[in-house]
């Protein structure tokens, strides 16, 4: 094959492959910070805010690693993120922020602390265009420690994120 023809064939192949990669890009996700819904009656631990921030970072990294979502930067919207709280019971107050950030989905995580031993962790993935639940990852965690939170996040992403994106239990935080 003449080198000019080979160069054109390779150029077309590269363009087509690049288009396939672009077409399969992961949806942009507004990953909101973890919140605590504490019904334990216990005094909050001094490291709670750091633990919630760490859990949010672990969630962002774990979701990116799956290739299913690409996190958008919510930093420029920090005051709006703070005002849209508590997200686990505000209806869809977080959706305008997600849309402003250019996200296709909003990811809303919460830890419901029942006691220092028992908590539940929920992560809702919500379609930013219409507020419909895309998926719900939920489970129990044991312990009120950074290690328990990290393990809980990794477990939920690894074992509860459905392959087809259908709701695991259907419920959105409303």
Model-derived segments and spans:
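Short, solvent-exposed, polar/charged sequence segments at loop or secondary-structure edges
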Residues: 65-108
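Hydrophobic residues positioned within well-ordered beta-strands of beta-sheet architectures
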Residues: 107, 121-122
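Short, well-ordered secondary-structure micro-motifs
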Residues: 41-42, 83-85, 119
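Generic, well-ordered alpha-helical segments
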Residues: 51, 55, 86-89
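N-terminal secretory signal peptides that target proteins for export/translocation
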Residues: 1-5
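C-terminal/domain-edge helix-coil "capping" segments
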Residues: 25-39, 55-58, 62-67, 96-101, ...
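Bacterial N-terminal signal peptides
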Residues: 8-20
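Glycine- and acidic-residue-enriched helix-capping/strand-helix junction motifs
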Residues: 42-54
């Amino acid at each position: 094959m003449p080198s000019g023809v080979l160069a054109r064939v390779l150029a077309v192949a590269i363009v087509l492959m690049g288009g396939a990669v672009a077409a399969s890009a992961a949806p942009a996700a507004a990953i909101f910070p973890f919140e605590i819904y504490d019904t334990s009656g216990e005094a909050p631990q001094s490291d709670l805010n750091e633990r919630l921030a760490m859990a949010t970072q672990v969630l962002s990294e774990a979701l990116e690693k799956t290739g299913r979502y690409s996190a958008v930067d919510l930093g420029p919207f920090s005051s709006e993120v703070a005002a849209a709280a508590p997200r686990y019971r505000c209806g869809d107050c977080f959706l305008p922020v997600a849309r402003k950030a250019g996200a296709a989905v909003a990811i809303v995580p919460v830890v419901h602390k029942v006691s220092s031993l028992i908590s539940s962790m929920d992560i809702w993935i919500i379609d930013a265009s219409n507020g419909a639940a895309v998926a719900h990852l939920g489970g129990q965690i044991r312990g009120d420690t950074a290690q328990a939170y990290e393990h809980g996040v990794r477990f939920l992403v690894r074992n509860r994120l459905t392959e087809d994106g259908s709701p695991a239990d259907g419920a959105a935080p409303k």
